[in-house]
């Protein structure tokens, strides 16, 4: 076989081995952190949670997630992805199940905080893990193959959650309790499966032939040697100025993205006056639209190579959608604005994480990715909390969405300014992808 044939076969085998399993884990990751948005349709009234209490509880997850993300990713780089991702999945699944016993706002806050602590490091850990297996020119498509689980978790989870809400009375449990129990158990099982299924590095992959192992190992070693900022320690990597600049766009994404995600079912029901089950189906349709954009965004990002430009475009969708949610009447038009907003996620996510993995290598990459994710993810606390507080105190969420749209616009301008500083060009002989001279 020619070298290009070896490359094609190797990357296909790596993709088929790793991406479906990580994709499944990621679906439940998102399902267990965001299923309170569906549970809230029933839980808030039963437990008498105010808008402010729900918003704070939804967001407090991200405070602990942010605090423990960097140390979690450093441990992953030391002990290997197989064991650490398994630990994360098992503990978050058990804590997700424990949400069914919540009765007071304080208990709600405590379990959400512990859930964030348990899940800390999963997403940046997966990004780092992919950077060990996928060359830069394949990475956006690999990332898109994983994070398409974000909208699909809602496409599947919203109707499933709506159905589980209908189990009220079965086993003397409320429907929202069944929701947390049923959706929390699978990650525990997947965590144990990860111990047997995942492989830490290409050099250890017995499921690849010797020729395939040699190709991917040498290719990844070559990329590590050519890394733009070849920091030799995690602490030195954290001083890279571009990493700190990248925090703002990600913070903007998390603030408006999580703010919208946790409130979407309630906003849809308020706008259309639908039942809980019908609301869940409509929410699923919104995320289905976003899911269809993921593979297209990943292919386009790899083809043109303009990572920062694509990231800015994603934030522009968030901005336009946020303005629409704020200003349009509470009708189907507001639901369409929510759909426009959610389309920004695949465009942003498939490109953004290619930038830090190009800047850093090894444990430095693990630390850098975790730094961006941990600080940026605090937006997941502020977004839902701000919407809930303003909704309760002013009776409207329009001001909150206008402010979040402005933050998204600021993040887009930062990405545009970063294009020259993070230039990325695909290899001329990349199979199936035209060479590009555009910047990242």
Question: Which role fits each region the language model picked out?
Answer:
Residues 77-89, 302-315:
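Cytoplasmic membrane-interface "Motif A"-like loop-to-helix N-cap segments
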Residues 111-148:
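Cytoplasmic helix-loop-helix junction between adjacent transmembrane helices
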Residues 67-106:
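Conserved MFS/SLC helix-loop-helix module at the cytosolic interface between two early adjacent transmembrane helices
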Residues 141-165, 187, 373-383:
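Glycine-rich segments within core transmembrane alpha-helices of 12-TM secondary carriers
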Residues 362-394:
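A late C-terminal transmembrane helix in Major Facilitator Superfamily
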Residues 48, 80, 101-107, 118, ...:
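Helix-breaking motifs and short loop linkers at transmembrane-helix boundaries and internal kinks
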Residues 36-37, 237-295, 349, 353:
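Extracytoplasmic gate region of multi-pass secondary transporters
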Residues 307-355:
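C-terminal transmembrane helical hairpin of 12-TM major facilitator-type secondary transporters
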